[in-house]
Design a protein with these regions (language model features):
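C-terminal regions of RecA-like/P-loop NTPase motor modules
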Residues: 5-7, 299-307, 312-419
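P-loop NTPase motor domains
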Residues: 25, 39-51, 57-287, 345-349, ...
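Conserved P-loop NTPase motor cores
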Residues: 1-20, 29-32, 36-38, 55-61, ...
Length: 419
């Protein structure tokens, strides 16, 4: 977890960490972000002959995220079909039991969370209306939809789940209240089957190109009003990366999935439990989750279990109120708080921070190389400076960033000015 408020040098620090990571360990790197903060880093990797895949999620992008793509495993791994009532009883047991780190992946539980996100829109008042019987019916519908799609020889899409719920609504053997609830849930799914969201979530998904670096710009989904769609998209990204990790678990190459602006992702209280369900097994697959955020205030209390799984906390210079936000999720001693508050920074020079691990508590000073500092410059004046060089010299944005890096080297006294 890298935590750094606005202006703390988070992007530059991440660029430097990513470069060291790729140079030394060469994992398969996935970066999810909003705002194209790492577009220049991806261009830099491509210039160094690493394979790069850039994905931008926006209308007309042609991307399908297929949130229920793993449902076929429920059919390929036979399980005893149970009734809605039995499923709801199992849910109560699952919610109350402590999870074992060695347990197998709960695909049905994961897909239920996705369905709940879509049906409730991630709204607290809608989530509060859900009963255990509703969740049991969702799971039953997922199993029915998965069977229908599997028998048809295709991947399950959101429309299959809607059809299963409408089928339940038409079954006279079910109580009227359950039929009405099934109808309502089916209609709620319709939001994710129209327009841009239908393009993303109601089509079969394709395998991503093999690449050393995959940059996912969340684009339109990062805007206000798309919170539920963003959460569903993130679950699909996690599943996609998980499938690659499972496929390549016997290879010696690891996977790193880094999420910038993580506070945008985890605002939904259902998402942190979903991430925990999958990521807790990633160490066995050689996959690692990195989170970077400028705002812990938006992390709901349900994120505590996810954040407790974090081994390394890198906390860049921060004000007192942000230190208290860290204390919501991680117990801090008075000495640790004092250390966090003592960190300082000098723009374009260095940023101090604190590393908190089980065996290490230390103040550090991050001095990113000029190139990675230039690649991570995201402020408006920084972009304007690059643009001026691009227009004056007819060069690419990456070349302009390199020139700014040289200017920083000159200012730092480690290079001579061009004559």
């Amino acid at each position: 977890m890298l935590f750094g408020p606005t202006g703390s040098g988070k992007s530059a620090t991440l660029n430097s960490l990513f470069a060291q990571l790729m140079a030394i360990h060469r994992p398969r790197l996935f970066i999810a972000e909003a705002g194209n903060s790492f577009g220049l880093f991806a261009d830099y990797c491509e210039e160094l002959e690493l394979t790069v895949n850039k994905v931008s999620i926006k209308p007309g992008c042609g991307i399908s995220l297929a949130p229920f793509a793993d449902a076929h495993r429920l059919i390929e791994t036979p399980a005893v079909m149970v009734s809605e009532e039995e499923l709801s009883e199992r849910i109560e047991t699952e919610d109350s039991d402590e999870e074992d780190d060695d347990e197998e992946r709960d695909i049905l539980g994961e897909l239920e969370i996705v369905a709940r996100l879509m049906i409730t829109g991630g709204e607290a008042k809608e989530e509060a209306k859900l009963e255990r019987a509703d969740r049991g019916m969702m799971r039953e519908a997922i199993l029915v939809a998965a069977r229908a799609a599997y028998n048809a020889g295709r991947q399950i899409v959101t429309g299959d789940l809607q059809a299963a719920l409408y089928q339940f609504a038409a079954e006279e053997a079910r109580p009227e209240v359950r039929r009405t609830r099934a109808q309502n849930m089916g209609e709620s799914l319709g939001v994710f089957m129209l327009g841009f969201l239908g393009e993303l979530f109601d089509r079969p998904g394709d395998n991503w190109p093999e690449a050393d670096v995959t940059l996912i710009d969340l684009g339109t989904l990062a805007r206000e009003g798309y919170e539920a769609a963003l959460a569903v998209a993130y679950t699909s990204l996690v599943n996609t990366i998980n499938n690659i990790a499972e496929r390549d678990q016997f290879l010696d190459r690891e996977i790193v999935f880094a999420t910038d602006e993580a506070h945008m992702i985890t605002t939904n209280p259902l998402l942190a439990p979903f991430v925990v369900k999958i990521v807790k097994m990633w160490r066995k697959l050689g996959a690692w989750l990195w989170l970077a955020t400028q705002n812990l205030e938006d992390f709901p209390n349900t994120s505590k279990k996810m954040l407790n799984m974090i081994e390394w906390w890198l906390c860049l210079v921060m004000p007192p109120e942000e230190v208290e936000e860290i204390a919501r999720f991680k117990k801090l001693t008075a000495e640790q708080k004092a250390m966090l508050l003592s960190a300082t920074k000098t723009p374009y020079c260095y940023t101090e921070g604190v590393v908190l691990v089980s065996r290490i508590e230390a103040l550090f000073r991050a001095v990113p190389p000029s190139l990675y500092l230039a690649l991570g410059m995201t402020e408006k004046e920084d972009k304007a400076a690059r643009r001026a060089i691009m227009q004056a010299q007819g060069v690419s944005e990456l070349a302009a960033a390199k020139q700014i890096a040289h200017q920083l080297d000159v200012a730092r006294g480690i290079a001579k000015a061009a004559t």
